């Protein structure tokens, strides 16, 4: 049970009822937003619906409900109970939760020039205790802005993104060949099984290729065990973060718990390998005089003396750590939804093949000719967001739904719950990419927050979007994607949302020659 009287089945039932009560729905649909529903004076913060002010009692109930790994369902249940805004204190952490896109718009439009988001407590504790250098993920104010403006030019600007296309295309083609090898090994004409490990390696090879301009060989038949340890460390870092979210990480460190030791060891490995890669590629790049291709983000940063070397190292480490599990998980969910919805898969394949003909194989042009495919990535992230919330600390007092929320309060937009709310997404359980192509005066950009919003949105957003687009183009050209079982796969919160159990695919090649990709 999620909570007394409300089962998980009731929350996730097909054709589910809206989380918002009819009264709340009519307010949302009639006014298009929450803060202007009432013309009365704003109500005080303590009147926001809440399970109670005893944070430790709330945390006890949260644990009893197994909320730690099911926090996205916990949010949904609370919106059912309290309406479109509620506050909850877990331990000593107090937050306000919202799910209406119009409320999200008000939140983000008030964030100021130096937005601050929630920082994962054990990550902060590790960096502070071991005095590790920090990049834009942890920085704030002018220090954050200085680094971020430089990095935006390297990884967010349209001209910079074009440089990444040939690098990512080569990685994707090698991944397609990995799948063909798997098919040959099974000797059945297709591949059946779990490809999550291959996707992790693909994502790591992709981000290192963009950052360093060189390949690590993660998609070869024999993989460097040291590089694999880096991937394993990232997973361990996410996994061990969860138990320390609602209790002070310093307690785990003080008592030398297994959780803290494993967490610190994971970060140690991440920093060690990231530093090894950065130093190795740095000296290789310095010895080269000319480049026949784009040499990568690291060289571009170093060549212009745009940031101190320690800042570059810290930001490169954060990019590598954030570019593996997140992207690979979204790709896995994308393949899952395509396999669950074969008609949609065929529509996507038809668009890709038409784009290939029109662009004559030019991938830079192709990625501009697949709007439905890009919409399918949005639709995947609506149903399976990487982060269950997007957060901001208020700069000033803010009135939402006629409640005054004080400055410095943490406000969280519940991504997962928003994506499942019928008031904002009709027939929310249906995988329907076309919903993102429809033009309507009632839609808002703030329905899609998977990469955050504004100047503090995900730094790797453009890399991830390009990487996923090129990946799906090539997979759709080469394989028909099916599932071994059509039973729904549940999700668990492991700091990011992951499948509760392995997803087992059936991949059927669309070309007779299994040794080559369709576009070589």
Curated annotation (Swiss-Prot):
Catalysed reactions listed for this entry: 6 reduced [adrenodoxin] + cholesterol + 3 O2 + 6 H(+) = 4-methylpentanal + pregnenolone + 6 oxidized [adrenodoxin] + 4 H2O; 2 reduced [adrenodoxin] + cholesterol + O2 + 2 H(+) = (22R)-hydroxycholesterol + 2 oxidized [adrenodoxin] + H2O; (22R)-hydroxycholesterol + 2 reduced [adrenodoxin] + O2 + 2 H(+) = (20R,22R)-20,22-dihydroxycholesterol + 2 oxidized [adrenodoxin] + H2O; (20R,22R)-20,22-dihydroxycholesterol + 2 reduced [adrenodoxin] + O2 + 2 H(+) = 4-methylpentanal + pregnenolone + 2 oxidized [adrenodoxin] + 2 H2O
Positions of transmembrane segments: none
Cofactor requirement: heme
InterPro entries from the UniProt entry: CYP11_CYP27_families, Cyt_P450, Cyt_P450_CS, Cyt_P450_E_grp-I, Cyt_P450_sf
GO BP annotations, alphabetical order: C21-steroid hormone biosynthetic process; cellular response to peptide hormone stimulus; cholesterol metabolic process; cortisol metabolic process; glucocorticoid biosynthetic process
Residues engaged in binding heme: 458
Keywords carried by this UniProt record: Cholesterol metabolism, Heme, Iron, Lipid metabolism, Membrane, Metal-binding, Mitochondrion, Mitochondrion inner membrane, Monooxygenase, Oxidoreductase, Steroid metabolism, Steroidogenesis, Sterol metabolism, Transit peptide
Database matches in PROSITE patterns: CYTOCHROME_P450 (PS00086)
Subcellular location: Mitochondrion inner membrane
Enzyme Commission code(s) on record: 1.14.15.6
Gene Ontology CC annotations of this record: mitochondrial inner membrane
Membrane topology, record value: Peripheral membrane protein
Entry-linked Pfam families: p450
Pathway(s): Lipid metabolism; C21-steroid hormone metabolism; Steroid metabolism; cholesterol metabolism
Annotated organelle transit peptide span: 1-36
Main location: mitochondrion
Family membership noted in the UniProt record: Belongs to the cytochrome P450 family.
Function: A cytochrome P450 monooxygenase that catalyzes the side-chain hydroxylation and cleavage of cholesterol to pregnenolone, the precursor of most steroid hormones. Catalyzes three sequential oxidation reactions of cholesterol, namely the hydroxylation at C22 followed with the hydroxylation at C20 to yield 20R,22R-hydroxycholesterol that is further cleaved between C20 and C22 to yield the C21-steroid pregnenolone and 4-methylpentanal. Mechanistically, uses molecular oxygen inserting one oxygen atom into a substrate and reducing the second into a water molecule.
Assembly with partners or alone: Interacts with FDX1/adrenodoxin.
PANTHER family named in the record: CHOLESTEROL SIDE-CHAIN CLEAVAGE ENZYME, MITOCHONDRIAL (PTHR24279:SF3), CYTOCHROME P450 (PTHR24279)
Name used for this protein in its record: Cholesterol side-chain cleavage enzyme, mitochondrial
UniProt lineage: Eukaryota, Metazoa, Chordata, Craniata, Vertebrata
């Amino acid at each position: 049970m999620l909570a007394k009287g409300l089962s998980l089945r009731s929350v996730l039932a097909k054709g589910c009822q809206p989380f918002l009560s009819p009264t709340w729905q009519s307010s949302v649909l009639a006014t298009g937003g929450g803060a202007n529903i009432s013309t009365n004076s704003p109500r005080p913060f303590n009147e926001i619906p809440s399970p109670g002010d005893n944070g430790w009692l709330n945390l006890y109930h949260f644990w009893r409900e197994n909320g730690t790994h099911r926090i996205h369902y916990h949010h949904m249940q609370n919106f059912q109970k309290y309406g479109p805004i509620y506050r909850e204190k877990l331990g000593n952490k107090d937050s306000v939760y919202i799910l209406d896109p119009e409320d999200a718009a008000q939140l983000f439009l008030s964030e100021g020039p130096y937005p601050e988001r929630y920082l994962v407590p054990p990550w902060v504790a590790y960096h502070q205790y071991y005095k590790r250098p920090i990049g834009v993920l942890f920085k704030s104010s002018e220090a954050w802005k200085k680094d971020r403006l430089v990095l935006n030019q390297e990884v967010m600007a349209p001209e910079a993104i074009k440089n990444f296309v040939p690098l990512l295309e080569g990685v994707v083609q090698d991944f397609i060949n990995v799948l063909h090898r798997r098919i040959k090994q099974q000797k059945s004409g297709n591949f059946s099984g779990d490809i999550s490990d291959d996707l992790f390696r693909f994502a790591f090879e992709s981000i290192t290729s963009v950052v360093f301009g060189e390949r690590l060989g993660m998609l070869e038949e024999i993989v460097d065990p040291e590089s694999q340890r880096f991937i394993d460390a990232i997973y361990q870092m996410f996994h061990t973060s969860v138990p320390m979210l609602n209790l002070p990480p310093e307690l785990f460190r003080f008592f030398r718990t297994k959780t803290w030791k494993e967490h610190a060891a994971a970060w140690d490995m991440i920093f060690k390998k990231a530093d090894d890669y950065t130093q190795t590629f740095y000296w290789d790049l310095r010895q080269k005089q000319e480049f026949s291709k784009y040499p990568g983000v690291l060289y571009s940063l170093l060549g212009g003396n745009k940031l101190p070397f320690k800042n570059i190292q810290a930001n490169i480490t954060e990019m590598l750590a954030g570019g593996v599990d997140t992207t690979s998980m979204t790709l896995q969910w994308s393949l899952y939804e395509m396999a669950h919805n074969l008609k949609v898969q065929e529509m996507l394949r038809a668009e890709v093949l038409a784009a290939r003909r029109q662009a004559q194989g030019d991938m830079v042009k192709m990625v501009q000719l697949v709007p439905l495919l890009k919409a399918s990535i949005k639709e995947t992230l609506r149903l399976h967001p990487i982060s269950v919330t997007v957060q901001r600390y208020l700069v000033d007092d803010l009135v939402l739904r006629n409640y005054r929320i004080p400055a410095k309060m943490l406000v969280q937009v519940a991504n997962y719950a928003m994506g499942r709310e019928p008031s904002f997404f009709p027939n929310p359980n249906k995988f329907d990419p076309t919903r993102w192509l429809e033009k309507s005066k009632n839609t808002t950009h703030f329905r899609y927050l998977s990469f955050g919003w504004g100047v503090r949105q995900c730094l790797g957003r453009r890399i991830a979007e390009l990487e996923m687009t090129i990946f799906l183009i090539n997979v759709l050209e080469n394989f028909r994607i099916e599932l071994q079982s059509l039973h729904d796969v549940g999700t668990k919160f492991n700091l990011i949302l992951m499948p509760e159990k392995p997803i087992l695919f059936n991949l059927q090649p669309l070309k007779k020659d299994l040794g080559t990709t369709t576009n070589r």
